[in-house]
A protein has these predicted regions:
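Short beta-strand scaffold segments in enzyme catalytic cores
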Residues: 41-51, 179-180, 390
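Zn2+-dependent cytidine deaminase-like catalytic core
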Residues: 46-153, 242, 276, 302, ...
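Short gly/pro/ser/thr-enriched loop/turn and capping motifs at secondary-structure boundaries
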Residues: 120-123, 224, 251-253, 279-280, ...
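Conserved histidine-centered catalytic loops in small-molecule metabolism enzymes
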Residues: 277-278, 363-395
């Protein structure tokens, strides 16, 4: 997920290639990060008949106008005569919370439309493009000038709406894991102390990430040691987030109203996950509380640990489409071990903590042969102050 930024929008009339316009459309799409779920992030750029930049737009919030509408809403028929529209995702053909973008565009005096990805819904895939063709507008799938560039852009186009694509194809929650460690991979002292490993710049970016996912998940250890608020504190974002807590044995539910998060969040926005075998005991504990979070009773595996696949399946049913896991070492490694993490955000600070008195976030993951090592695919890197971050897909 890209950082919120002040994009360098070209001056009107600036010549742009289709590749450059698509790259700008991708960057534009990320502006909607905190507000569009469960819809995909989409960006759109309009070029005039001579290939000069005219305007850009993005899908700003769920239920609001789509990127194509925002890109053309302030343009006249003369501005759009012979224009070329570049958009990251095929214009929608169906009527939903908003009218069909394809039908809207078909009424404009455009010459051409280029879209980055075909609509993933097989029932409507290609229909948006066909509506435009029937109106006499060229509509084609984006292809970069050379093979390497095309592969790179294809990856970027998939990444910009990766949670949406995962939801549609798999009907599962898209899971991202955020970790912060020292150079030697330590995430906390053995006492549990971990504040702070990374700097203020990294932590601000994490609050941006919190806003971009439907929920924030932590384990009970994080609650016990840090008593965190788990809210979003970012200078550019005002948003109430949802929190998921894994407390398999229900140890902390009786103290819920004493926790900071109970004051920071409406009870309906907190989801407390406990073993289904303990349902009766947990319900007894919650009767004594003045307010109660939403309870999620989860199947257990051999050994008593919660079945994380069942947990995610229940969260999907409850409306979650993406989740940022920020839990401690045990929570993080548990999700990685069972192959449930789609994307990793790994922040590292230029410090060394040493393994003798610290904990690694992978200490429960055991790999016997190098051929079984875990790969981070399509990694990208960013710096935040003195820290750096690597992010990529885990396969």
């Amino acid at each position: 997920m890209e950082q919120i930024s002040s994009l360098n929008i070209p001056v009107r009339g600036t010549p742009m290639t289709v590749d450059a316009a698509m790259a700008l459309a991708i960057n534009e799409a990320y502006k909607g990060g905190p507000r569009v779920s469960p819809n995909p992030l989409v960006g759109c750029v309009v070029l005039d008949s001579q290939g000069g930049f005219v305007s850009a737009g993005h899908h700003e919030f769920y239920g609001g106008p789509h990127a194509e509408v925002n890109a053309v809403k302030n343009l006249s028929a003369e501005d759009l005569k012979g224009a070329h529209v570049i958009v990251t995702l095929e214009p929608c053909a169906h009527e939903g919370k908003t009218p069909s973008c394809a039908k809207m565009l078909a009424k404009l005096p455009l010459k051409r439309l280029t879209f980055g990805l075909i609509d993933p819904n097989p029932l409507v895939a290609g229909q948006g493009a066909e509506i435009l063709r029937q109106a006499g507008i060229e509509a084609d799938l984006y292809q970069a000038d050379d093979l390497k560039r095309d592969q790179e852009m294809r990856i970027r186009l998939e990444e910009v709406c990766e949670a949406f694509l995962w939801n549609f194809r798999q009907k599962k929650v898209f899971v991202a894991l955020k970790m912060a460690s020292s150079l030697d991979g330590q995430v906390a002292l053995k006492s549990g102390e971990s504040q702070w490993i990374t700097g203020a710049e990294s932590r601000e970016y994490v609050h941006y990430l919190r806003a971009c996912y439907d929920g924030l998940l932590v384990g009970k250890g994080t609650i016990e040691f840090d008593n965190p608020s788990l809210n979003i504190r970012h200078p550019q974002i005002e948003k109430k987030n949802k929190v998921v807590v894994i407390d398999g044995e229900g140890d902390l539910i009786g103290r819920y109203t004493d926790l900071k998060l109970s004051n920071e969040h409406d009870a309906d926005n907190v989801f407390w996950c406990v073993a289904e075998d303990l349902k009766e005991d947990v319900l007894k504990k919650t009767k004594k509380l003045s307010k109660t979070p939403q309870l999620v009773f989860v199947k257990t595996k051999v050994g008593g640990n919660l079945d994380l696949e069942d947990l995610l399946a229940q969260l999907y049913t409850l409306g979650f489409r993406s989740m940022l896991v920020e839990g401690g070492a045990l929570t993080a490694s548990s999700f990685v071990e069972v192959g449930l993490v789609n994307r990793l955000y790994m922040f590292q600070a230029p410090i060394i903590m040493g393994s003798a008195g610290s904990k690694s976030w992978t200490e429960t993951i055991r790999i016997e042969e190098m051929k079984n090592k875990i790969f981070i695919q399509h990694p990208t890197y960013k710096t935040f102050g003195n820290d750096f971050m690597i992010t990529g897909r885990i396969q």
